[in-house]
């Protein structure tokens, strides 16, 4: 194979079936309508850290280099080895890549993409991000409610949903749950079609898919591509990345783009790719899968490729493939640049752009078709359905709360009004406070588990960050922290025989709720934006352990050195424990058999609740009680603000 710059001319009408039967259907139908997406001189560079040592400057890495091409209505496949840049190119075309380090133009029918392109086009991610606790129809209803304009009636939206269900062949499973790790649901192919249906609700003219066959068996993968082929015949421009498709899938492609190391190896009609590489010096054995053959060429796998051995193909290139890979990719890229395919593509690109330099648009704006309140209602509705549809966690939490309440009630049953009563009251109130904190650690999952779902739906214009944030709080966080506090108070309060007044009972319940909400808010502030639950859980546990030390039971806060005492003001258990002590001890008498004279002489004995509170440094006034709730409320606001800002500024583009 020569590296000279001699033009490799391959007639555009040439077709090579490689021994396979030709298709008689009009798979290569020319579309007169539909969107034509063209990309001009796309370059993408990222800065990566060169090491863990501080002070090292990041190194710039080229991901895509001068990529040009045209995607017309039909099936447009982007093929390449792992790390070749196919997913990066797909994200660039779909306006879902971080614009920093990106240059070049992407045009739709010769014009710049609209600012709401991400919302008008469809994008199916590699990992299916659908709510598994909902049915197929309910998932599509959620997409329709938030992505279709409010001017459409519910009847029109339902007609659109039914049409999508029928088009995707989901009629039999429309009312079946998609499925989770705990709930058996639809098959993998039906789940993938549901993900596609979520995007088809808006009837996009361009549909992007990131490796739609990943995780599917060969038969299911073939069925998914046949579905996409039928959709492309309706005039849709379908662009997708794929890795090693079998021949029955490959023959469905209308256009093929081959990438390696961010360079363009081939771009043109898929059925003419074999003839192109054969004229370039590569021959595919009969009945070999063309897609595998192309990857073998790019990877330099000479054991599977029959090469025209020229004088410059030396034995060292076979022995040391790592030294040969980069030059081989460069040679293939140069051969393509010298081919007639590249020349005709450039001429068509020039015609589409009108020869004018377009202004690059940064696509970070997201438009919404619905109001904040409408989005809030639907996010809350879906979250509540998800809670009811996956009752294992919620029911388990309630059962554990009931059992733990009964155990604590049995241990501290019938508190006495003596010196032991003081110790036992302080102990059980401390336990109630710390238990509320540690049971709130589960709140870290609220945003971590749905991170991919949130990012995809936010970029696609389903809802605002604020709608999602408050919707999750109202439907998930509030009820799941309120109910255990109510149950715990009702069980424990009367079994322990605490102060028998209604106001004391409800103050205790309110205090436990505030502790649970503040601890959960702290969990959200730590976990928001995280990808791993275990990391957030570990950080939460460490924080609560330090907070316990400054809660007021393990050490008397009045005895702590001044240079450390300020840490008590950051302790959630301290505020809860102080409020519970103020509520329970105020007005109590623990020495009913002693008169005032004896009580005055026995300064070492604590006979009243006021004395105990004074020794703990607790203010006896009503403000001494309510200031703890004010502090907890302030912490809730601060932590929720941090969580919201972390979601708002979360890196949503790859």
Curated annotation (Swiss-Prot):
Full protein name: Broad substrate specificity ATP-binding cassette transporter ABCG2
Q: What does this protein do?
A: Broad substrate specificity ATP-dependent transporter of the ATP-binding cassette (ABC) family that actively extrudes a wide variety of physiological compounds, dietary toxins and xenobiotics from cells. Involved in porphyrin homeostasis, mediating the export of protoporphyrin IX (PPIX) from both mitochondria to cytosol and cytosol to extracellular space, it also functions in the cellular export of heme. Also mediates the efflux of sphingosine-1-P from cells. Acts as a urate exporter functioning in both renal and extrarenal urate excretion.
GO CC term (a single one): membrane raft
Q: Where is the ABC transporter domain?
A: 37-286
What are the disulfide bonds? Answer: 591-607
**GO: which molecular function terms?**
ABC-type xenobiotic transporter activity; ATP binding; ATP hydrolysis activity; ATPase-coupled transmembrane transporter activity; biotin transmembrane transporter activity; efflux transmembrane transporter activity; protein dimerization activity; riboflavin transmembrane transporter activity
Q: TM spans, by residue?
A: 395-415, 428-448, 477-497, 506-526, 535-555, 630-650
Known EC number(s)?
7.6.2.2
Q: Which residues lie on this side of the membrane: Cytoplasmic?
A: 1-394, 449-476, 527-534, 651-654
- One Pfam family assigned to this protein is ABC2_membrane_7
Q: Which domain of life is it from?
A: Eukaryota
Q: How is it modified after translation?
A: N-glycosylated. Glycosylation-deficient ABCG2 is normally expressed and functional. Phosphorylated. Phosphorylation may regulate the localization to the plasma membrane, the homooligomerization and therefore, the activity of the transporter.
Example GO biological process: renal urate salt excretion
> Secretion signal: which residues?
none
Q: Which residues lie on this side of the membrane: Extracellular?
A: 416-427, 498-505, 556-629
Positions contributing to ATP binding = 80-87, 184-190, 211, 243
Location(s) in or outside the cell = Cell membrane; Apical cell membrane; Mitochondrion membrane
Q: Which UniProt keywords apply?
A: ATP-binding, Cell membrane, Disulfide bond, Glycoprotein, Lipid transport, Membrane, Mitochondrion, Nucleotide-binding, Phosphoprotein, Translocase, Transmembrane, Transmembrane helix, Transport
The record's annotation in SUPFAM superfamilies points to: P-loop containing nucleoside triphosphate hydrolases
**Glycans attached where?**
417, 556, 595, 599
Which CDD domains does the record associate with it?
ABCG_EPDR
Q: Which organism is it from?
A: Macaca mulatta
Give the catalysed reaction(s), semicolon-separated.
ATP + H2O + xenobioticSide 1 = ADP + phosphate + xenobioticSide 2; urate(in) + ATP + H2O = urate(out) + ADP + phosphate + H(+); indoxyl sulfate(in) + ATP + H2O = indoxyl sulfate(out) + ADP + phosphate + H(+); sphing-4-enine 1-phosphate(in) + ATP + H2O = sphing-4-enine 1-phosphate(out) + ADP + phosphate + H(+)
Q: Which gene encodes it?
A: ABCG2
Q: How does it assemble?
A: Homodimer; disulfide-linked. The minimal functional unit is a homodimer, but the major oligomeric form in plasma membrane is a homotetramer with possibility of higher order oligomerization up to homododecamers.
């Amino acid at each position: 194979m020569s590296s000279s710059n001699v033009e490799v001319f391959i007639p555009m009408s040439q077709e090579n079936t490689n021994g396979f039967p030709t298709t008689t259907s009009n798979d290569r139908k020319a579309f007169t309508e539909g969107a034509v997406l063209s990309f001009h001189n796309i370059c993408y560079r990222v800065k990566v850290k060169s090491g863990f040592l501080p002070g090292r400057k990041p190194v710039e890495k080229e991901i895509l280099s001068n990529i040009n091409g045209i995607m017309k209505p039909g099936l447009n496949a982007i093929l390449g080895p792992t790390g070749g840049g196919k997913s990066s190119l797909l994200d660039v075309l779909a306006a879902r890549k971080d614009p920093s380090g990106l240059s070049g133009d992407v045009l739709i029918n010769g014009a710049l993409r609209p600012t709401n392109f991400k919302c008008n086009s469809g994008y199916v991610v590699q990992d299916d991000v659908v709510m598994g606790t909902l049915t197929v129809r309910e998932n599509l209803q959620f997409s329709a409610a938030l992505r279709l304009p409010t001017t459409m009636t519910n009847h029109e939206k339902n007609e659109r949903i039914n049409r999508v269900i029928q088009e995707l062949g989901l009629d039999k499973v429309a009312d079946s749950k998609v499925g989770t790790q705990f709930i058996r649901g639809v098959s993998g192919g039906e789940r993938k079609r549901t993900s596609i249906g979520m995007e088809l609700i808006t009837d996009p003219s361009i549909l992007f898919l990131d490796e739609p066959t990943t995780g599917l068996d060969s038969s299911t993968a073939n069925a998914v591509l046949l579905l996409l082929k039928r959709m492309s015949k309706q005039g849709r421009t379908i662009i997708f990345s794929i890795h090693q498709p079998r021949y029955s899938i490959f023959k469905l492609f209308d256009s093929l783009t081959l990438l390696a190391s961010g360079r363009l190896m081939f771009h043109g009609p898929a059925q003419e790719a074999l003839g192109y590489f054969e004229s370039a010096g590569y021959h595919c054995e009969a009945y070999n899968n063309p897609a595998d053959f192309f990857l073998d060429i790019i990877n330099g796998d000479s054991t599977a490729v029959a090469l025209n051995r020229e004088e410059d193909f030396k034995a060292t290139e076979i022995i040391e493939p790592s030294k040969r890979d980069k030059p081989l990719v460069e040679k293939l890229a140069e051969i393509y640049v010298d081919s007639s395919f590249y020349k005709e593509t450039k001429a068509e690109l020039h015609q589409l752009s009108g020869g004018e330099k377009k202004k690059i648009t940064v696509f970070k704006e997201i438009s919404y078709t619905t109001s904040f309140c409408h989005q809030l209602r639907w996010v809350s509705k879906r979250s509540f359905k998800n809670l009811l549809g996956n009752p294992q966690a919620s029911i388990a939490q309630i059962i554990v709360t009931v059992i733990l309440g009964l155990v604590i009630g049995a241990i501290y049953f019938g508190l006495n009004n003596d010196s032991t009563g003081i110790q036992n009251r302080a102990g059980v109130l401390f336990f109630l406070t710390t238990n509320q904190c540690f049971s709130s650690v589960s709140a870290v999952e609220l945003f971590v588990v749905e991170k991919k779902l949130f990012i995809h739906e936010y970029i696609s214009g389903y809802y605002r960050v604020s709608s999602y944030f408050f919707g999750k709080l109202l439907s998930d966080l509030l009820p799941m922290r309120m109910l255990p506090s109510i149950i715990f108070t009702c069980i424990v309060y009367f079994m322990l025989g605490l102060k028998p007044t209604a106001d004391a009972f409800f103050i205790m319940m309110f205090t436990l709720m505030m502790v649970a909400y503040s601890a959960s808010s702290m969990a959200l502030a730590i976990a928001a934006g995280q990808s791993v639950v275990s990391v957030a859980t570990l950080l939460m546990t460490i924080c609560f352990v330090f907070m316990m030390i400054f809660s007021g039971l393990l050490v008397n806060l009045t005895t702590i050195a001044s240079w450390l005492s300020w840490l008590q003001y950051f302790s959630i258990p301290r505020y809860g424990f102080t409020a519970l002590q103020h509520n329970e001890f105020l007005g109590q008498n623990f020495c009913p058999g002693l008169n005032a004279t004896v009580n005055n002489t026995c300064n070492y004995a604590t006979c009243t609740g006021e004395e105990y509170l004074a020794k703990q440094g607790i203010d006896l006034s009503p403000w001494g009680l309510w200031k703890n709730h004010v502090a907890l409320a302030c912490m809730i606001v601060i932590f929720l603000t941090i969580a919201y800002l972390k979601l708002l500024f979360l890196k949503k583009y790859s």
